[in-house]
């Protein structure tokens, strides 16, 4: 029953993101956090699913990608991912654990909950932004995608306030998010021992669902 709920949720949320360019990822994240008991698996699985969804949207709207924005975002994203990896390594070293999965405190689920509350109730409308903001937001997104899972609500105001066309928002934002989700795969593989291939029976139906929903 839980698998069916996740498959339906994956399809509907990917369809939502395909239509308006945002909102689907964090909705799916919240549903997965309720059903899947372990926080790091929520983020790891969600990352793979959203990687497929975002790559599909990027491909469909590829002619509308804003390359200069992506370049600025990538400049900040890589340091953000490296900083995330360094923090996880530091935590495992400090607590003397073989894997980050062995950390006694499951901090990821509370972080997801706080993030969703912020997105729904506390987020304020941003004012006009500069082009350099994409670099700094890349750093923040590199941390958020690892420790929370969904960075869409963080970076969405940049695209909206940049007055891009709808198609450009969908394509460029999807490309940025895809890069973040791709970048965290080795982090969860190395530090949390997440074996994506061993979990194919869980992930494959969800991946197919988001692909169909996006198309």
Stretch-by-stretch model annotation:
Residues 75, 79-84, 110-121:
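Hydrophobic transmembrane alpha-helices of multi-pass small-molecule transport proteins
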Residues 1-36, 122-173:
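Selected transmembrane alpha-helices and immediately adjacent juxtamembrane segments
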Residues 53-65, 118-129, 157-161, 213-215:
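C-terminal ends of transmembrane helices
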Residues 33, 88-92, 96, 118, ...:
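Membrane-water interface at transmembrane helix exits
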Residues 39-46, 67-72, 163-175:
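Membrane-interface alpha-helices at helix entry/exit sites of multi-pass transporters
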Residues 44-98, 182-215:
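Selective hydrophobic functional segments
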């Amino acid at each position: 029953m839980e698998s069916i709920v996740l498959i339906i949720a994956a399809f509907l949320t990917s369809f939502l993101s395909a239509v308006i360019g945002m909102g689907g990822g964090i909705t799916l994240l919240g549903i997965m956090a309720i059903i899947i008991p372990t926080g790091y698996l929520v983020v790891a699985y969600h990352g793979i699913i959203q990687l497929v969804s975002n790559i599909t949207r990027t491909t469909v709207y590829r002619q509308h990608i804003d390359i200069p924005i992506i370049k600025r975002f990538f400049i900040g994203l890589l340091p953000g991912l490296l900083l995330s990896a360094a923090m996880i390594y530091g935590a495992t070293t400090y607590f003397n654990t073989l894997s980050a999965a062995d950390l006694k405190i499951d901090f990821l689920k509370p972080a997801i909950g706080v993030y969703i509350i912020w997105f729904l109730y506390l987020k304020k409308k941003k004012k006009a932004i500069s082009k350099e903001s994409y670099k700094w937001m890349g750093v923040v997104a590199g941390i958020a995608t690892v420790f929370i899972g969904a960075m869409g609500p963080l970076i969405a105001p940049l695209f909206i306030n940049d007055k891009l066309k709808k198609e450009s928002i969908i394509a460029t934002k999807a490309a940025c998010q895809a890069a973040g989700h791709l970048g965290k795969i080795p982090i969860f593989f190395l530090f949390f021992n997440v074996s994506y291939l061993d979990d194919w029976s869980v992930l494959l139906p969800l991946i197919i669902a988001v692909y169909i929903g996006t198309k």
